Swiss-Prot record:
It comes from Levilactobacillus brevis (strain ATCC 367 / BCRC 12310 / CIP 105137 / JCM 1170 / LMG 11437 / NCIMB 947 / NCTC 947). ATP binds at residues 14-19, 71. Belongs to the CTP synthase family. This is CTP synthase. Allosterically activated by GTP, when glutamine is the substrate; GTP has no effect on the reaction when ammonia is the substrate. The allosteric effector GTP functions by stabilizing the protein conformation that binds the tetrahedral intermediate(s) formed during glutamine hydrolysis. Inhibited by the product CTP, via allosteric rather than competitive inhibition. Pfam families: CTP_synth_N, GATase. GO terms for biological process: 'de novo' CTP biosynthetic process; pyrimidine nucleobase biosynthetic process. Its EC number is 6.3.4.2. Pathway: Pyrimidine metabolism; CTP biosynthesis via de novo pathway; CTP from UDP: step 2/2. It is an enzyme of class 6 (ligase). The lineage of its organism: Bacteria, Bacillati, Bacillota, Bacilli, Lactobacillales. Catalyzes the ATP-dependent amination of UTP to CTP with either L-glutamine or ammonia as the source of nitrogen. Regulates intracellular CTP levels through interactions with the four ribonucleotide triphosphates.
Length: 535
């Protein structure tokens, strides 16, 4: 029988529910158990694909092409499993599917209601997540905060799950806050008590409380929380701020979180061997060097807009014993006059993905600087397209070279709309999304990054592509097209082999990076940047 673990949050948002879910997933996986994780987001958007990065942060893409919440990136990095479309579900998705079934007559004329139809669809998504990925344990994070009107259908659905599959197959974990009042020099448990009372009022009694704190909670405080919230004192687990999120599984294991969960389920499993993970975390906290990487982007005011890029860079720093000092540079503020001042101290330059024409000229200036000054450079998605435009302008001499996304009337369409996108008018879920094969050129930097494999699989999110009319001309000037689709039609990777490192990919390599297994392009880019550090 599949076991279900539900993670809710109270008091305030951003308590780290996703990291708690991911950490528990890691602990259970290291016990030899099959685990998957999913998140329910209570907003009306069908998916986050069309949402403003400043509001939502990064859009994470799964193998099957689903545009998801950034928490799925954390899930994949922690449990090292690739997730799918059942791993992120929104209110909008649930309602759209229910309404579609109603239009098809599937409900046989019944009055369609939140209960049972919406809650039934939610439960179906929960169960299907485990079935499609062959998981024995499904960890489900409920987005938002208990008490929010938007979350009520999800909370009602997970309440019903206990009756449907049995108490012995369901665990409720509630994350909450124990704030420290500096003026009074005192920690307060009342917000946690009220949050649990709110959860209990809708029929959910948490089995475990994970309390976010600035300082350790005392035994007396633990007993007080347990008494008022009707849980065992051992099930009050503290989650303090830590230097790296990857240490949280170790902190939770020390407090027996995974064992408490398994005891409730009556499941016997070997203790999680976290030796390799602990060694990795120890290494992360004792890095001897610092590498300065300039990220030139459009959404730099919000770090979460590039969270997977930032994580992939940190992962790539570990093999060279280096911490990454990531300098977020607003592309709009880069000009020919100040580029040296802005980027002169960087050991490497990265231009990540994005959409629209804002900041494009600054990105072109930054890439020109990297190419001419031989600063290690990595371009991703839009970064690859802009690198192609820069080469056309400054090497081929086509001053007005551009992408038709930025300038439909350009006479040199270096980047153009993909043929199968010409008749697409919907914005959401219509790009080239998900895992696609990429053929690598033998002897190239790209091939070396992937251990000289001939074919790799990478995740994409774009609707524009390189215009093959310019391929021969650029090749003659030294640009190498080192990665293409298997039929050689779509350009996937470009590089300048004579440079220390100048590689750009149409796909998103950051989505497949892991803390214990850095992604190849990021690894080699950071290694090249490490050789630029002035010790």
């Amino acid at each position: 029988m599949t076991k279900y673990i539900f993670v809710t949050g109270g008091v305030v948002s951003s308590l780290g529910k996703g990291i708690v879910a991911a950490s528990l997933g890691r602990l259970l996986k290291n016990r030899g158990l099959n685990v998957t994780i999913q998140k329910f987001d209570p907003y009306i958007n069908v998916d986050p694909g069309t949402m403003n990065p400043y509001q939502h942060g990064e859009v994470f893409v799964t193998d099957d092409g689903t545009e998801t919440d950034l928490d799925l990136g954390h899930y994949e990095r922690f449990i090292d499993n690739n997730l799918n479309k059942y791993s992120n579900v929104t209110t909008g998705k649930i309602y759209s599917e229910v309404l579609e079934k109603e239009r098809h007559g599937d409900y046989l004329g019944a009055t369609v209601q939140v209960i049972p139809h919406i809650t039934g669809m939610i439960k179906e998504k929960i169960m299907r997540a485990g079935k499609t990925l062959g998981a024995d344990f499904v960890i489900t994070e409920i987005g938002g905060t208990v008490g929010d009107i938007e979350s009520q259908p999800f909370l009602e659905a997970i309440r019903q799950m206990k009756a449907e599959v049995g108490d012995e197959n369901v665990v409720y974990i509630h994350t909450t806050l124990v704030p420290y009042l500096h003026a009074a020099h005192e920690m307060k448990t009342k917000p946690t008590q009220h949050s649990v009372r709110e959860l209990r009022s809708i029929g959910i009694q948490p089995n475990i409380l994970v309390v976010r704190t600035e300082a350790p909670i005392t035994d007396d405080m633990r007993k007080k929380i347990a008494l008022f919230c009707d849980v065992d004192p051992s099930a009050v687990v503290e989650s303090m701020d830590v230097p790296t999120i990857y240490s949280i599984p170790l902190r939770l294991q020390d407090q027996g979180l995974d064992q408490i969960v398994l005891d409730h389920f009556g499941v016997q499993a070997p203790k999680a061997d976290m030796t390799a993970w602990a060694q990795m975390v120890d290494h992360m906290q004792h890095l001897s060097r610092t590498i300065k990487i300039a990220l030139v982007g459009k959404y730099v005011a919000l770090h979460d807009a590039y969270i997977s890029v930032a994580e992939a860079l940190q992962h790539a720093g570990y093999p060279v014993d280096a911490n990454i000092d990531l300098q977020m540079i607003d592309a709009e503020k880069i000009t020919d006059d100040n580029v040296q001042d802005v980027l002169g101290s960087a050991d490497g330059i990265i231009v990540p993905g994005g959409f629209g024409d804002r900041g494009i000229e600054g990105m072109i200036t930054a890439i020109k600087y990297a190419r001419e000054q031989d600063v290690p450079f990595l371009g991703i998605c839009l970064g690859m397209q802009v690198a192609s435009i820069e080469f056309a302008r400054d090497v081929l001499g086509y001053a007005d070279a551009n992408s038709t996304e930025m300038n439909p009337d350009t006479s040199h369409k270096i980047i153009d709309l993909m043929a199968d996108q010409a008749d697409v008018h919907e914005m959401g879920g219509t790009q080239r999304l998900g895992l696609y094969p990429c053929k690598l050129k033998a002897g190239s930097r790209a091939a070396a990054a992937y251990d000289n494999q001939e074919m790799i699989q990478e995740r994409h999110r774009h609707r524009y592509e390189f215009n093959n009319q310019y391929r021969d001309e650029m090749t003659a000037k030294g640009l190498v097209f080192s990665g293409t689709s298997p039929d050689d039609h779509l350009v996937e990777v470009i590089e300048l082999p004579e440079k220390k490192f100048f590689v750009a990919a149409q796909y998103h390599p950051e989505f497949l990076s892991r803390p214990n297994r850095p992604e190849g392009l990021f690894r080699d880019f950071v290694a090249a940047a490490s050789r630029e550090v002035k010790d």
